[in-house]
Amino acid sequence: MPTKPARDLQTFPNPKPDRPYEIAMECPEFTCVCPVTGQPDFATIRLRYVPAERCVELKSLKLYLWSFRDEGTFHEAVTNRICDDIVQAIAPRWIEVVGDFAVRGGIHTVVTARHGERPAGV
């Protein structure tokens, strides 16, 4: 497995696909670049999902998130891209991606992207 930034999300079989359960992850060191100013933007990315047949492998997720560090992108775009890419990789029953960005210009931005319907009782 690579040890440098990569957009390739690795997956593995869900060990309990018949049981709806939630997986939650947090990356407090996410960085991208403001496409307007060229300055770095810092965020905590929070993922919560209910897997179907596949799960996201953690090291590949770290390297995937790391791959945005030099990319110019708006908060809204990158949060939705992360959600879309994970949906493409694992087709979860439900997913929520929250981009909680550090204050910039006196404004604190939180972007939430969701896909699917959260199963009842999870």
From Swiss-Prot:
EC class name:
oxidoreductase
Quote the pathway field. Answer: tRNA modification; tRNA-queuosine biosynthesis
Q: Is the keyword Transferase assigned to this protein? A: no
Q: Which reaction does it catalyse?
A: 7-aminomethyl-7-carbaguanine + 2 NADP(+) = 7-cyano-7-deazaguanine + 2 NADPH + 3 H(+)
Residue stretches in coiled coil: none
Q: Name one GO biological process term.
A: queuosine biosynthetic process
This entry's Enzyme Commission designation comes to 1.7.1.13
Cellular compartments annotated: Cytoplasm
Q: An example Gene Ontology cellular component term from the record? A: cytoplasm
Alphabetized UniProt keyword annotations: Cytoplasm, NADP, Oxidoreductase, Queuosine biosynthesis
Task: Respond yes or no to whether keyword Transcription is given for this record.
Answer: no
Q: Which residues bind substrate?
A: 56-58, 75-76
Q: Which InterPro entries match?
A: GTP-CH-I_C/QueF (IPR043133), NADPH_dep_7-cyano-7-deazaG_red (IPR050084), QueF (IPR029500), QueF_type1 (IPR016856)
Q: Which family does it belong to?
A: Belongs to the GTP cyclohydrolase I family. QueF type 1 subfamily.
Classification via NCBIfam families: QueF-II
**Protein's name in the database:** NADPH-dependent 7-cyano-7-deazaguanine reductase
